[in-house]
Amino acid sequence: YQIPLELRNLPIIESALNPKAVSRVGATGLWQFMLATGKTYGLQVNSLVDERRDPIKASFAAAHYLSDLYKVFGDWNLVIAAYNCGPANVNKAIQRSGGSKDYWQIYPYLPKETRGYVPAFIAANYMMTYYSKHNICPMHSTLPAQTDTMMVARNIHLQQIAGVLGIDIEQLRALNPMYRRDVVPGATQPYAIRLPLADVNRFIEMEDSISNYRASELLTNRMQVEVNDDVPTYYHKSKRYVKSRKWRVTRRSHMHRGSKSKARRGKASHSRKRSKARSRRRR
């Protein structure tokens, strides 16, 4: 995408390099993609998989997005500002400044958070370049330096892999942060898992044993609420016929993808009560 190498340090101020980071407004992953932007750039998000949390896929998506922003603004400082507050806010700041496309000229018209964002990015780049001059020592990663990616075409739980291959479950989660519930839903479509290179051949040889290990316990089918499902559709999927006037889901306003809900029969209306009473009197 022909973007400056220094932009690799952007996740330092976005997420502190935490692939599972979630902001108060729902931005997720190393690059803090909002749901709509992530989907625009090809990142899959559902109740089991959130590719915004995949460091590799999210980095490709971020590079694509940053490249697109540069085509709009033609200045990397403005691109970085737009990455933080959105291109619409940067355009407003440009208009209020009289049409200038210099970051420091539009600085007073940017949102407060964004005014500190570009300086923070400059500071992060300085730190990553000159850390040794300030006696800053990098921490060594506890994750394996060499990994490989395997495509899986069946449902597998990370605990199945950990149990059979003897890999630490937290290490597996760190290598595969995109799986929100530790489930790789390969039966729906092939998904990739990352393993320490030393364990790849054993995984290939023992895949059937891994798939059968505690399968009934770890891969029990659970009904999930999809984002676009309304309540009657949700119960139709679970093979129950539901009429919305007879049933209601409690606290529906808090439902989201993957959430569980309770349903209870609503009280009969006064008109129905009166009609039932008249019916009994006629008998």
Q: Which residues make up each language-model segment?
A:
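Extracytoplasmic and endomembrane cell-envelope/extracellular-matrix remodeling and assembly machinery
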Residues: 1, 40, 45-48, 52-72, ...
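Export/targeting segments at the very N-terminus of extracytoplasmic proteins
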Residues: 1-16, 63-67
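Glycine- and small hydrophobic-enriched segments that form the cores of compact globular domains
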Residues: 3, 18-22, 29, 47-48
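Alpha-helical scaffolds flanking conserved acidic
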Residues: 4-12, 28, 76-81
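A general structural motif at alpha-helix termini
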Residues: 11-14, 34, 107, 175-176
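Short, surface-exposed glycine/acidic/tryptophan-bearing loops
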Residues: 21-42
